[in-house]
């Protein structure tokens, strides 16, 4: 009987990528298959996030729920990976003695050896070391589950923003060699992937050797140009970028590489220079706006999303007003916005914070309501237009329909003959947008590629 692994992922797309790799590693080493049901699993893994306190505490809450499964199934192994594991280490086992494995983002490739050691010794195994970029040398080829895929191009962060734990949980920035990344992307393209998202905590800080051991370095713009030349790749996305690393070379890439989508996620975090300085972000609002101005000179319709923190220590009403002014000026399509959550061990955790919680909550609600207005306005402006989408699979709303994504990352549901579904999935097609809804669009097929056209008849 095939053994199964269940992985629950918290946090960012880097963690989603790492979770897929955990499954790949265990499949290659032990033949385990992924399950979406923890009750069916022989191994349960939590890939954790420590960016906010709420996410961290939810891990321990979920661990408590699977404890009963372990009591009913003694051979079940429970593991905690990711940033909480890196930050807490062996204290996780002290708090939850039924946990068998604790591993960091850089040691997930050692899972088979840790499992063997746990079974042989009967003791919990903890490995939260930072062996640079070693894990990529030990990962099996990716198993593709659709026409889109994530590719991690670097690990860690060296920015040390005053509020952030990532440099402490993932280590400093280390880039994969260029040829390693290109080999992975080419392998994905051979399996039918048409869109890749290049991942890194500060992805545009990429500085990868041309090959292992080479002294020549490729920057992020060079990497994008090479990825665009790989046969089969039709779209390139990346996340998360940092304003401080947005070079003119990267800006020029938006003119040179049409496959680079017309959407950018560029976290600003705040709209007040005073708060940005306290956050140690390393740029001013004017410098941030300058990057966007240059990009929109090349791509006038570039859509923009961001991250924002409300209620950072010392934030005044004037600071918040400046944030809202920036939101209106930039016209953000989406914002991942949260109330500041102090993280132990970060400089900002020691700052005086005298803003009442209810004030922070009102500010957050105002910010999110404004962003939602932007989202609705942009979605409505797309009605009547023809959009190029990548068909990802059956619609969640109606399995008799198909769904795909626009360049600005909106889901479009559209009807198509059932017999055409297998051939349409993975194709780039054109749809006319007929309706805009709060979280999706609806359209109709108007133009397809030759292959897809044949599939509809």
From Swiss-Prot:
CDD domains, sorted: Radical_SAM (cd01335)
GO CC annotation, single: cytosol
Record keywords, A-Z: 4Fe-4S, Cytoplasm, Iron, Iron-sulfur, Metal-binding, S-adenosyl-L-methionine, Transferase, tRNA processing
Single GO MF annotation: N6-isopentenyladenosine methylthiotransferase activity
Cofactor note: Binds 2 [4Fe-4S] clusters. One cluster is coordinated with 3 cysteines and an exchangeable S-adenosyl-L-methionine.
Pfam families hit by this protein: Radical_SAM, TRAM, UPF0004
UniProt binding sites for [4Fe-4S] cluster 2: 157, 161, 164
InterPro entries to which the protein is assigned, alphabetical: Elp3/MiaA/NifB-like_rSAM, Methylthiotransferase, Methylthiotransferase_CS, Methylthiotransferase_N, Methylthiotransferase_N_sf, MiaB_methiolase, rSAM, rSAM_horseshoe
KW S-adenosyl-L-methionine (keyword) present: yes
Catalytic activity: N(6)-dimethylallyladenosine(37) in tRNA + (sulfur carrier)-SH + AH2 + 2 S-adenosyl-L-methionine = 2-methylsulfanyl-N(6)-dimethylallyladenosine(37) in tRNA + (sulfur carrier)-H + 5'-deoxyadenosine + L-methionine + A + S-adenosyl-L-homocysteine + 2 H(+)
EC number(s) from the headed UniProt entry: 2.8.4.3
MTTase N-terminal domain ranges (all copies): 3-120
UniProt cross-references to SUPFAM superfamilies, sorted A to Z: Radical SAM enzymes
Family according to the record: Belongs to the methylthiotransferase family. MiaB subfamily.
Subunit structure, as described in the record: Monomer.
Described purpose of this protein according to its UniProt entry: Catalyzes the methylthiolation of N6-(dimethylallyl)adenosine (i(6)A), leading to the formation of 2-methylthio-N6-(dimethylallyl)adenosine (ms(2)i(6)A) at position 37 in tRNAs that read codons beginning with uridine.
Protein name: tRNA-2-methylthio-N(6)-dimethylallyladenosine synthase
Organism for this UniProt entry: Burkholderia cenocepacia (strain ATCC BAA-245 / DSM 16553 / LMG 16656 / NCTC 13227 / J2315 / CF5610)
Gene behind this protein: miaB
């Amino acid at each position: 009987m095939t053994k199964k692994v269940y992985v629950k992922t918290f946090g960012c797309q880097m963690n989603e990528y790492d979770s897929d790799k955990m499954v790949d590693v265990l499949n290659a080493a032990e033949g385990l298959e992924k399950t979406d049901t923890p009750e069916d699993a022989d191994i349960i893994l939590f890939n954790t996030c420590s960016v906010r306190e709420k996410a961290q505490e939810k891990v321990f809450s979920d661990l408590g729920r699977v404890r009963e499964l372990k009591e009913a199934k003694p051979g079940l192994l429970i593991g905690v990976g990711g940033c909480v594991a890196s930050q807490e280490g062996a204290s996780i086992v002290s708090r939850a003695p039924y946990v068998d494995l604790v591993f960091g983002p850089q040691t997930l490739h050692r899972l088979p050896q840790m499992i063997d050691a746990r079974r042989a010794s009967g003791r919990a195994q903890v490995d939260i070391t930072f062996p640079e970029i070693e894990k990529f040398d030990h990962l099996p080829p990716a198993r593709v589950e659709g026409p889109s895929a994530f590719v991690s191009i670097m690990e860690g962060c060296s920015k040390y923003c005053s509020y952030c734990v990532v440099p402490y949980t993932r280590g400093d920035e280390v880039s994969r060699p260029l040829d390693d990344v290109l080999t992975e992307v080419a392998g994905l393209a051979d399996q039918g992937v048409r869109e890749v998202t290049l991942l890194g905590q500060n992805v545009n800080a990429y500085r990868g050797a041309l090959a292992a051991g080479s002294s020549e370095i490729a920057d992020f713009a060079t990497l994008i140009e090479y990825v665009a030349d790989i046969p089969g790749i039709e779209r390139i996305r990346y996340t998360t970028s940092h304003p401080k690393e947005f070079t003119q070379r990267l800006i020029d890439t938006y003119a040179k590489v049409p496959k680079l989508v017309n959407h950018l996620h560029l976290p600003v975090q705040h709209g007040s220079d005073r708060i940005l300085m306290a956050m140690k972000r390393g740029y001013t609002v004017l410098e941030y706006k300058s990057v966007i101005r240059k990009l929109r000179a090349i791509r006038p319709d570039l859509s923009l999303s961001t991250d924002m923190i409300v209620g950072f220590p010392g934030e005044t009403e004037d600071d918040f007003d400046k944030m809202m002014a920036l939101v209106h000026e930039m016209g953000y399509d989406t914002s991942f916005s949260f109330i500041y959550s102090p993280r132990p061990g970060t400089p900002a955790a020691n700052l005086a914070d005298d803003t009442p919680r209810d004030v922070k909550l009102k500010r957050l609600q105002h910010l999110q309501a404004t962003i939602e207005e932007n989202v609705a306005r942009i979605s409505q402006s797309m009605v009547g237009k023809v959009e190029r989408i990548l068909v990802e699979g059956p619609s969640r709303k109606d399995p008799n329909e198909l769904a795909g994504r626009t360049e600005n990352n909106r889901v479009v549901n559209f009807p198509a003959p059932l017999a055409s579904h297998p051939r349409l999935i993975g194709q780039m097609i054109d749809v006319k947008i007929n309706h805009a809804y709060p979280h999706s669009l609806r359209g109709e097929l108007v133009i397809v590629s030759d292959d897809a056209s044949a599939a509809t008849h």
